[in-house]
From Swiss-Prot:
Membrane spanning stretches: none
InterPro entries named among the record's database cross-references: Ribosomal_eS8, Ribosomal_eS8_CS, Ribosomal_protein_eS8_arc, Ribosomal_Se8/biogenesis_NSA2
Quaternary structure and partners: Part of the 30S ribosomal subunit.
Coiled coil: none
Protein name: Small ribosomal subunit protein eS8
Pfam families (UniProt xref): Ribosomal_S8e
HAMAP family (alphabetical): Ribosomal_eS8
Source organism superkingdom: Archaea
Gene3D superfamilies hit by this protein: 2.40.10.310
UniProt similarity note: Belongs to the eukaryotic ribosomal protein eS8 family.
Keywords: Ribonucleoprotein, Ribosomal protein
An example molecular function term from Gene Ontology annotations: structural constituent of ribosome
């Protein structure tokens, strides 16, 4: 069944709201990519509204980490997810989202990109 992102048919009181218009295709959604740390890279290209393309990163083991002290960016390996405010279960499953704290070869880093939307993991090195 499709994911629908329109308004609910119920009010906060529980009363039923009668719809003035039917459901439209533009209100449909898709399941989240949930980018995982893996030993291989897997991307999925999806057609979006207006014939645009969106690259969803499903699995990866690399991130572009920016070191603010030295003003240098490096492609480094990601070992695991340390913290994720989006969902506490994402830590155990090694799912990266924007704002997640990951462990890399350079040290701890915070993800600044949206891997499920951008197709790449960009992060900023955290100073300890």
């Amino acid at each position: 069944m499709a994911i629908w992102q329109g308004a609910s048919r119920r009010l906060s009181t529980g009363a039923k709201v009668w719809r003035a218009a039917k459901k439209h295709k533009r209100e449909m959604g898709r399941p989240a990519a949930e980018t995982q740390v893996s030993d291989r890279i897997k991307r999925k290209i999806v057609r979006c509204r207006g014939a645009n393309l969106k690259v969803k990163l499903e699995k990866t083991n690399y991130a572009n980490v920016f070191d603010q002290a030295n003003k240098v960016c490096k492609k480094v390996a990601v070992t695991k997810v340390l913290d994720n405010k989006a969902n506490k279960h994402y830590i155990r499953r090694n799912v990266m989202t924007k704002g997640a704290i990951i462990e890399t070869e350079m040290g701890k880093a915070k993800v600044t990109s949206r891997p499920g939307q951008d197709g790449v993991v960009n992060a900023v090195l955290l100073t300890e």
